[in-house]
Swiss-Prot record:
GO terms for cellular component: cytoplasm. HAMAP family: EFP (MF_00646). This is Elongation factor P-like protein. InterPro entries: Elong-fact-P_C, NA-bd_OB-fold, Rib_uL2_dom2, Transl_elong_fac_P/YeiP, Transl_elong_KOW-like, Transl_elong_p-like_YeiP, Transl_elong_P/YeiP_cen, Transl_elong_P/YeiP_CS. The lineage of its organism: Bacteria, Pseudomonadati, Pseudomonadota, Gammaproteobacteria, Vibrionales.
Length: 188
């Protein structure tokens, strides 16, 4: 059984008799000497989708829920539902747009390496690869000879995500984006 300090974003945990999916974790360090470090977790109930914010001391023991990961690819949009297809047995997994809004900024039909987290036979979340390749649709014109400077400019991707890119990058180029930090890594 891991401590609260060992829990990572994207984990499925058991708390108060329910299974929750951890979406965000923030570390709170009190300014007093004797205060214990707290971990504030934003979690979603797997069964109902209800949001819950809980704080745990760093050494609180937390039960991990049983879950599995399945490799999948984005298939199509059906109204407000996004459908992903299992890469091995072609099982469709449906997600409501609001439940995966943040992940959708990185997902296109070409995105490889998606993982679906399944708890009790139901899909609960999408795990993104560490980096994805996206195409730039809107940015300021590239500046010749700007490769020596470290200045950046905003660029909008095909998914609507906006990141800072070097000045020498132009519209239509594919770039590699870090999905955890939302930052430009390199040309694709």
């Amino acid at each position: 059984m891991p401590k609260a300090s060992d829990i990572k974003k994207g984990s499925a945990i058991e708390h108060n008799g329910k299974v929750f999916f951890v979406k965000e974790i923030s570390k709170l360090t009190p300014s007093g000497r004797a205060g214990a470090t707290l971990f504030r977790m934003r979690m979603y109930d797997v069964a109902t989708g209800a949001k819950s914010d809980e704080s745990f001391k760093a050494d609180d023991m937390i039960n991990l829920a049983d879950f599995s990961r399945r490799s999948a690819t984005f298939s199509y949009v059906d109204g407000n539902e996004y459908v992903f297809m299992d890469s091995e047995d072609y099982t469709p997994y449906n997600f409501n747009k609001e439940a995966i809004e943040e992940e959708l900024l990185f997902i296109t039909e070409e995105t490889q390496g998606l993982q679906i987290l399944i708890v009790d036979g139901a899909p609960v979340a999408i795990e993104l690869p560490s980096a994805v390749d996206l195409e730039i649709v809107e940015t300021a014109p590239s500046i010749k000879g700007a490769s020596a400077s470290a200045r950046t400019k905003p660029a909008t991707m095909t998914t609507g995500l906006t990141v800072q890119v070097p000045e020498y990058i132009a519209n239509g180029e594919k770039v590699k984006i870090n999905t955890t930090e939302h930052k430009f890594m390199s040309r694709a």
